[in-house]
A protein has these predicted regions:
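Rieske [2Fe-2S] iron-sulfur-binding subdomain
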Residues: 1-49, 83-131, 555, 559, ...
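Pre-active-site segment of Zn-dependent metallo-hydrolases
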Residues: 27, 31-35, 40-69, 122-129, ...
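Core dinuclear metal-dependent hydrolase active-site scaffold
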Residues: 31, 117-183, 239-313, 403-457, ...
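Active-site HxH/HxHxD metal-binding segment of metal-dependent hydrolases
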Residues: 69-106, 163-164, 175-245
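Active-site neighborhood of phospho(di)ester-bond hydrolases with catalytic His/Asp-centered motifs
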Residues: 77-78, 155-156, 184-198, 216-219, ...
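Cap/insert and terminal regions of metallo-dependent hydrolase folds
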Residues: 217, 290-392
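Short, aromatic/basic amphipathic alpha-helical patches
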Residues: 223-236, 368-372, 376-386, 551-552
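Feature captures hydrophobic
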Residues: 403-596
Length: 596
């Protein structure tokens, strides 16, 4: 028997009779529950059993037998090819990443502890809604305005400027009054710290008018607003709320924030309830609330597009040919499309809306990324959902379009959606590139980069070490061509040293070419490297072709929340080094100069 335990109760999720148990072969056994179709892996060795969910902890992919495994202990994820040694429950590619959650063994009973359904606390019976009482207006990307009786709530306001340094730009033109709507909001929910959801250019405009608007975020391990002080944006009413607890706004309106299982340090989602009617927004969560979500909500919205990563577009060497990239991207988008359709079908919301995927690599220097990084089409996803679950109403939003929830619930055939007037500009055609790129490039001439010892100071601050990886970082121009006199250096993270040549020992190696303006902006301000990687601002090659989860996870999510003390650094620079030095340093062999 496989059991699940909710709080202190258990229920059977998979039952194996004695014949089925006897027939388990040594090694890996794949099993599916006939009741709910959920999959499990049972590993048998010397008569002992181990079991886990057949679901990769990276992004939820399904495991299959690894044809390269000669010992019969390893399975491979069909999504990103991560590998799990089921005998140890350790991921072996990438190494040192996750530990798979093992189902506890007790004789032939295997038990899993799972999270309960917190939205069931203090249940509310749905009340009849009047026309116009609850409306949902799509503004752009992940930004929605909810009119909930007398209250206005806004999700993830990104209304101006780029995201991820200069890599992402808004695809849709927000309605002309979007900023005014934001300033009139009664409350704002920001799901996580990524800059397509937490947009400091947008919040800077908001703070000039409404610095005290209530903003709600989840209590993530890395604070959502960890960069607030450095941003110099003045917001005075940020509320960090615990997960899984109803937050009451008035007698009819409440909301609950839930965290993601895969990225609990930052990703969250939200349930909004008004007069017993639920709206579920899973945002970018890979596995929100451990996969347990409310069924039959009135409205569900989620991401859908894919393409929110530099992989594989920014990689070169080995298998990374253009044809391989195209095939990989096509397959990934198809898998994501099918996953979203299946998720929506399983949850059976009355209405579903795909959003949070309307971005474009608009800057001319990123034309290659724009052409290569194809994304899912919202209308195609909705068509797939309608085919498999015809009872679900779908909505493909346009900027300024309004969904009236009461009308939609009364009859899907009624005119519940009001689209923007004919002739409205749907797609952006101007982004003020120079304004934002020039701001990033101002870091190039910062005083700290006149002294090559900034490299050692920065990586000691970053705090990543005792990991067998050697990285070469190269500063480049817009086209990723190394800059004459630009910095080109090695970091050996095994002992956090800065050699002039690669070590003689056998070692994993990664070469990262970064646009100089973005890299120096990131270094100067102590920002996370998602600006480089998710923002398509670098180009990468690696030997061997292994994803180093610990390295990238550290630099994308675990850097210190307090930035480098560059004032202290400049005070420590010897006086004879304070005269102007080259902006970078490069040896004839391409190796970095020795740091002292």
């Amino acid at each position: 028997l496989l059991h699940r335990k909710i709080m202190y109760e258990m229920y059977t999720v998979l039952s194996l009779n004695s014949e089925a148990v006897f027939s388990l072969k040594d090694g890996i056994n794949f099993k599916k529950s006939p009741d709910d179709g959920k999959c499990y892996i049972i590993y048998k060795e010397n008569g002992e059993l181990k079991a886990c969910k057949n679901q990769c902890k990276h992004q939820g992919g399904l495991f299959i037998k690894d044809i390269e495994d000669l010992d019969g202990r390893t399975v491979r994820c069909t999504k990103h090819y991560w590998k799990l040694n089921v005998s140890t429950m350790q991921y072996v590619n990438p190494p040192d990443s996750f530990t798979q959650d093992e189902l506890d063994e007790g004789g032939l009973q295997l038990v899993e502890v799972i999270v309960w359904d917190p939205w069931l606390a203090d249940p509310q019976d749905p009340q009849e809604l009047q026309e116009g009482e609850v409306t949902v207006t799509y503004l752009t990307h992940a930004c929605m305005e909810l009119q909930l009786g007398g209250k206005k709530m806004i999700f993830d306001p990104w209304l101006t400027g780029p995201a991820f340094a200069r890599g992402w730009w808004l695809l849709h033109e927000p309605p002309a009054d979007s900023m005014e709507r934001l300033c009139m909001a009664d409350l704002i929910y920001i799901s996580h710290m990524h800059s397509d959801h937490l947009s400091y250019p947008t919040l800077k405009s908001l703070s000039a008018t409404r610095p005290d608007v209530p903003i709600y975020v989840g209590d993530t391990s890395r604070p959502v607003f960890w960069m607030l002080e450095k941003s110099q944006v003045q917001l005075t009413n940020i509320n960090i709320v615990p997960f899984g607890i109803w937050q009451n706004i008035d007698e009819h309106l409440r909301f609950m924030i839930l965290k993601d299982e895969v990225h609990p340090e930052m990703d969250t989602c939200i349930i909004v309830e008004y007069k017993g009617h639920m709206i579920l927004n899973t945002v970018d969560c890979t596995r929100p609330n451990y996969g347990r979500l409310p069924h039959n909500v009135d409205l569900m919205m989620s991401d859908f597009a894919g393409g929110a990563s530099g992989f594989p577009m920014t990689f070169s060497g080995g298998k990374y040919t253009e044809s391989w990239k195209a095939d990989f991207i096509k397959n990934e988008r198809k898998k994501l499309m099918n996953y979203k359709a299946q998720l929506v079908k399983s949850l059976q919301p009355k209405i579903y809306c795909p959003f949070a995927g309307y971005f474009v690599e608009a800057h001319p220097s990123d034309r290659y990324i724009k052409e290569t990084n194809t994304k899912n089409n919202a209308e195609q996803l909705n068509a797939l959902i309608k085919k498999s679950a015809p009872g679900i109403t779908t909505w493909t939003p346009k900027p300024g379009a309004v969904l009236d929830l009461a009308l939609a619930l009364m009859s899907p055939s009624r005119k519940a959606i009001t689209d923007p007037p004919s002739g409205t500009n749907i797609y952006k055609d101007s982004w003020d590139f120079d304004l934002y790129v020039d701001e990033l490039n101002r870091a190039i001439t910062a005083e700290i980069f006149k002294h090559k010892s900034w490299i050692q100071f920065y990586y000691i601050w970053a705090g990543f070490k005792n990991y067998d990886l050697v990285v070469r970082v190269i500063e480049t121009d817009e086209d990723f061509i190394p800059i004459d006199n630009g910095y080109n250096y090695l970091v050996d993270f095994m002992d956090l040293s800065f050699p002039t040549q690669r070590p003689t020992r056998e070692h994993p190696y990664e070469e990262i070419k970064n646009r100089i303006g973005v890299m120096r902006h990131v270094v100067k301000n102590g920002l996370l490297w998602d600006n480089l990687y998710i923002g398509f601002q670098n180009r990468l090659s690696r030997e061997p072709d292994v994803y180093h989860h610990q390295f990238w996870n550290h630099f994308q999510t675990e850097l210190p929340v307090t930035g480098p003390d560059w004032d202290l650094f400049l005070q420590q620079v010897p006086s004879h080094q304070r005269s102007a030095e080259p902006q970078g340093i490069q040896t004839e062999s391409g190796s970095a100069s020795t740091l002292s």
